[in-house]
Design a protein with these regions (language model features):
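Multi-bladed beta-propeller domains
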Residues: 15-17, 25-43, 48, 58, ...
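Beta-strand-rich domains and repeat architectures in extracellular enzymes and scaffolds
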Residues: 1-20
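Short glycine/acidic-enriched loop and turn motifs that connect beta-strands
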Residues: 10-14, 60-63, 105-108
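Predominantly five- to eight-bladed beta-propeller fold
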Residues: 19-20, 103-149
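Repeat-solenoid scaffold signature
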Residues: 66-100, 104
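Short consensus segments that form the blades of beta-propeller domains
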Residues: 11-17, 57-59, 131-137
């Protein structure tokens, strides 16, 4: 039987926060079941391992990482231990590689440029034709590719290493 996995976000105005949970249902719309019930943000559920598992993003470990679980919500296991938040991911067709998106620092802060001035926050910009944003941006999303053995990633490579560009 074919199944669909999706997320639902719940919002609390008094608490000024949201929570996302994962649901699974049959493709015909029957048996709609919530499979996560916790305070963590879970999202982007993706079928993998021949449809036997769901991969998803979760911030249970303190940052957004790729996790796996069974279609009934049991057997949760963290698959990545990347030092920052993973914002999106996709497995290669053979399941042996993981492509993921994460923010990388692209501009040195004033404190990085001038360690002798730790309280300085000013920035002088001389190479922009016009101001095109309303805040100073020091990171950009980069695509990373990593080997995946079914349980963990290794050989992580930033495809745009050293570049200030955003992708995707």
């Amino acid at each position: 039987k074919k199944q669909i996995a999706y997320t639902v976000s719940y919002y609390s105005v008094p608490q000024n926060k949201s929570n996302s949970e994962v649901f699974v249902m049959n493709a015909d719309g029957s048996d709609n079941t919530q499979i996560t019930h916790d305070a963590w943000q879970e999202g982007q559920p993706t079928w993998f391992k021949d449809g036997k598992k769901l991969a998803f993003l979760c911030n249970e470990s303190g940052s957004s990482q790729v996790w796996e679980m069974n279609p009934d919500g049991s057997g949760r296991k963290q698959l990545t231990q990347y030092e920052g938040d993973i914002e999106g991911f996709s497995f290669s067709p053979d399941g042996k590689e993981l492509l993921f998106i994460a923010q990388v620092k692209t501009v040195k802060s004033t404190a990085d440029k001038h360690p002798d001035l730790p309280k300085a926050t000013g920035i002088i910009v001389t190479d922009l034709m016009y101001k095109h944003w309303d805040e100073w941006v020091t990171t950009a999303p980069h695509p990373f590719v990593a080997d995946f053995d079914g349980n963990a990633i290794s050989n992580v490579t930033d495809i745009l290493e050293g570049e200030p560009y955003e992708s995707p």
